[in-house]
């Protein structure tokens, strides 16, 4: 399990946004001070979007920051479901380097291999991996399904794989590419942002179960060697 897990609870969305923006800004600035560059993995979706938009306003040397999605849907980059498109729209105007992890490969497993090769060219490990979680316990795009074990136990040198969630999520019924649990586990810092009592209950159970968890998020957290801050917006 993660070396240490600390919960931060918020009653108001604005307070959570401010806290995450402040902490992520500090992480990025610390990486820039230490190494002259920063590599971060951000999630897509509706929950992180307002946080990312506010983060982009921070006085950070964005030209020295490389951003990758923690996961993405296998759709064209101009599709509304594309995580990298959302991230790029927010951060490219600030000068950040935003790299897609998807490709034109028709087969999701080939797309995963292409993503893994692309990530091999980056200065690793990431300075930050920012995770979310669904009500099925998935994190990044490590979903319950036939590819879950590959994403969770695919080898220390495998940074990304293709996955076919089963069942496909109704809000985005497409295959995906995701960072693996081992890649997430190498991060210098890690945070997880959720909202609502239902997700909190699931996450607490997943953490308690650890490496034996039926929830992907529990097993991912088990592989993270650094402390993890969890930001939770209460109902």
Segments the model singles out, each with a brief description of its role:
Residues 1-40:
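N-terminal glycine-/serine-/threonine-rich phosphate-binding loop
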Residues 2-4, 63-130:
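Ligand-binding beta-strand-loop-alpha-helix segment within the catalytic cores
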Residues 29-57:
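Glycine-rich N-terminal segment of FAD-binding domains in flavoprotein oxidoreductases
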Residues 42-47, 131-135, 195:
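Glycine-rich beta-strand-to-loop/alpha-helix junction loops that act as flexible
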Residues 54-62, 85-89, 144-153, 208-209:
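A glycine- and small-aliphatic-rich helix-loop capping segment at beta-alpha/alpha-beta transitions
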Residues 58-66, 152-154, 182-187, 221-225:
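Short, conserved loop/helix-junction motifs that constitute active-site signature segments
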Residues 135-182:
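Class I SAM-dependent methyltransferase SAM-binding "motif I" and its flanking Rossmann-like core
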Residues 180-182, 186-235:
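ATP/nucleoside-binding phosphotransfer catalytic cores, i.e., glycine-rich phosphate-binding loops
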